[in-house]
Amino acid sequence: MRLAVGALLWISLNVAAADAPVRFVMADSWAMPMVQLDRGRPTQGILYDIMLSLATQVGVPAEFHVLPRARVQGAMEHGEVDVRCYAAQSWLPNQSGDYIWSIPLFLQRDLLVSRQGPPASIVPASLKHESIGTVLGYVYPTLQPLFDNGQLQREDARNQEQVLDKLLVGRYRYAVTNQWTLDWFNQRLMPGRQLQAVAVLQEQNVGCYVRNDPKVPVQRILRTLLRMKMSGEIDDIIGLYTGAEPRTP
């Protein structure tokens, strides 16, 4: 009898472990096409679709935690969440904890954009006393010396879409965005009103990292991400939202 009870308990524990969700973290400053947040819950977007497909292929439920950007890394360190995507190791110089990184999955391409693109590209250092649309809390290494010496001024918004909305209505002449967001934003505008890239500020490969914990199916997650990248699934999801051919790392 005790053997039977023990066997049932072992089965129950293993079923519970198999059903444990993978907890993904998202920053509340993200906007489309990365993710659409409705009342604090993700409903669509590139990263939402990728995370949902990843969990399905791993065979576990997906659980989404939407947090202020400043709390994201702390949540990883304290074991409140398991997976963070769209990050680079260079963004986390003081990262503490045991993590395993995926291969590069995306190309982060930061652009300086304007309402009317001039005939030639702009050198940011040539700009004087301009307000630049930026996202609150984001760091822009190429522009930081110009912000520090007062040559340029930041004008922060809560997320990338708000930054571009303000540019479109003329709050400032230039803003920083990434290629995904620019492609998404321009899809809703007539050709004559579309925002134009005037400088490439930075290109960087980014991926996901997973908390290295026995309770987390780390290797299954990493293998699945590799398969999704190699099969073209990730690039197909990007193209679905941006309408553009993705730039592969």
How should each PLM-predicted stretch be described?
Residues 28-30, 106-111, 187-226, 245-249:
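Periplasmic-binding protein-like
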Residues 61, 139-152, 158, 226-249:
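Ligand-binding clefts/hinges and TM-proximal coupling segments of bilobed small-molecule sensing domains
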Residues 70-82, 125-126, 161-180, 188:
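Short helices/loops that flank or line small-molecule/ion binding pockets
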Residues 61-68, 152-166, 199:
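Short beta-strand-to-loop elements that line the ligand-binding cleft
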Residues 18-97, 134, 156, 221, ...:
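Extracytoplasmic small-molecule ligand-binding "clamshell" domains
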Residues 12-14:
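N-terminal signal peptide c-region/cleavage motif recognized by signal peptidases
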Residues 74, 86-96, 173-202:
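A ligand-binding cleft/hinge motif common to bilobed small-molecule-binding domains
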Residues 114-132:
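Flexible hinge/capping segments at coil-to-helix
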